[in-house]
Amino acid sequence: VPQAKHLLIGSTRSGSGKSATILGLTYNLQAKGYKVGYGKPIGTFTTKELPEAAERSEADVEFIKQTLSLPQSLLRPTLLNLDRSALQRRLSGEDTADYSDKLEEYKEIIEGDIVFLEAPANTAEGAIFGLSLEQMAVHLEAPILLVMRFGSLLVVDHILMAKRRFGDRLLGVVINDIPDEQYETAIEILHPYLENQGIPVFALMPENRTLRSVSVSEIIEQLGASILCQPENIDLGKIMVEELKIGAMDVSSAQSYFRKSYNKAVITGSSRIDLQFAALETSTNCLILTGRPFVNEDVAHKAMELGVPILAVSKDTLSTVSIIEGCLGQVRLHEGVKVTSICEMMGKHFNFDRFLKLMNIKTLAKV
């Protein structure tokens, strides 16, 4: 029986879009009739030492499993969660396990045409356990697909260094989050350059504001906010916020300032009724009030009419901004609108024929 082919999905920094890439690839390959497996050998480490880090890592695994209806037979177990206590046990000599042996057991599971293994946040993480991206690629004799956020044309340096490091193990790259104004440059200059360096480019993905947005229900959860006004028949999990604006100026300046942004949340003081009205006259998806948890009756009426929820937070403005910006900077997959967007984008921009050929997976007859 032929063994399932493993492919490591890695990146040089966290937040590059590995989980999203796996989701989009799996969905589209399933639609083509392939049996796809998934695993995350090493759970996510967080420098902030959030107690829910391991849970979040597990939640991502669980979410991908549920969303793609993956049976247990197609899942590879997580070998450890990379947190402070795991590191301390390793450093003190209490944990002497050979994780490469545990990784070898993946090879014995034959179910699936291809198995995507999500690597740690960057190329170094997990090395103390023998589970860095490169170490896993060697143990499993598996190729690496590198997922990179564009940032700027300087992304090429990181890709070239990865090629030097991984050599022929680097199957190719996916570059995502390319701003519209740089997309043509990426296609006409970056793509051919990388191909000439022997680095296959499977996809150049344009920036997608939906993916970097956050739902109002997620904002409520992260801020511990209370709801002062919730329009009827509005699902807060489906109202997406793409930008954040702070209202602390005079009202005439505020109007032009607010008009420049779409699908935004506006943070302002509960006493600034003038700014609340100004925000509601532009493309605002959520009002967040600081200070006294109070909303003016006329503002509430207008918000109900427009379908805009109003929240109250007890935190100061700076902390509130910091938390929401953290949410906006990360692609949290757990929202249906994002899943649909990812799967459609991957179907449109990813070169599946070339990918399957380089993975030596035979093309199935079209269903």
Describe each region flagged by the PLM:
Residues 1-4:
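Phosphate-binding P-loop
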Residues 7-16, 20-97, 106-107, 193:
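N-terminal phosphate/diphosphate-binding loop that engages ATP/GTP or pyrophosphate donors
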Residues 9, 37-41, 74-76, 115-119, ...:
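General beta-strand structural signal in soluble alpha/beta enzymes
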Residues 27-35, 62, 66-73, 108, ...:
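Generic secondary-structure signature for well-ordered alpha-helical cores
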Residues 88-129, 134-138:
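Phosphate-binding/switch loop-helix module in NTP-utilizing enzymes
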Residues 108-111, 255-264, 279-283:
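Flexible, charged surface loops at secondary-structure boundaries
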Residues 119, 199, 207-269, 325-367:
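Non-catalytic interface/targeting segments
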Residues 120-203, 208, 270-334:
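Conserved catalytic-core segment of NTP-binding enzymes
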